[in-house]
Amino acid sequence: SSANMSFRHKDRIYISATGSCFGTMKKEDFAVLSMDGTVLSEKKPSKEWPLHLALYEKSSETGAVIHTHSTFSVLWSFVPAKNDQDCIPDHTPYLKMKLGTVGLVPYEKPGSEALFQAFRERVGASDGFLLKNHGPVVPGKSVMDAFFRLEELEESARIAWELFRAGLE
C-alpha cells in the first residue's frame, strides 16, 4: 500500500490495515484501535497509525484522516519552505477556504518514532500537514471531507510546483 486512511466511530478508530489497497478496500481491511492506540482487532494497523491518533487527539471534530504519497505534494516538499507552518502557497483562495494552513514536518524515516515525535511537535500549529519527501496527512470531519481537503492540497501543490518550474514561484 502507498497510503493509509482512518475514521472515528464512537470510541474507536478504524484504520487501513498493513498491506491494504485503497482501490480494493473492504470493511474487513480495517484494523481497529482504541483512542489510546491499543490494537483491538486481529488485523495489524498501518505502521503510521500514530500520525492519525495525534490528529484525533488534537480535535474532537476530526472524524477521518487520510495520508497519501501523492505526486505533487511530494515534489513540493523538496522545495525549501518559506514558512514551515504554512508551506504550500495559496495561489487560489481554495486551499485556505477548504483546509487552512499546511505545516511542513521534517523528513524522518516512515513509520519511525522520530517521525511521530516530529509530527506531534507540529500538530497544534497547522490544519493539514506535509511530511517532507513523503506526502500529505489531512484530517476532516468525515472521510469525504478529508478527501476533499486532500484533493485541494494536492491541486495547490501542483499549481505551486508548475509555477516553481516556470520560474514564477
What residues fall within each predicted segment?
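Glycine-rich flexible loops
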Residues: 1-169
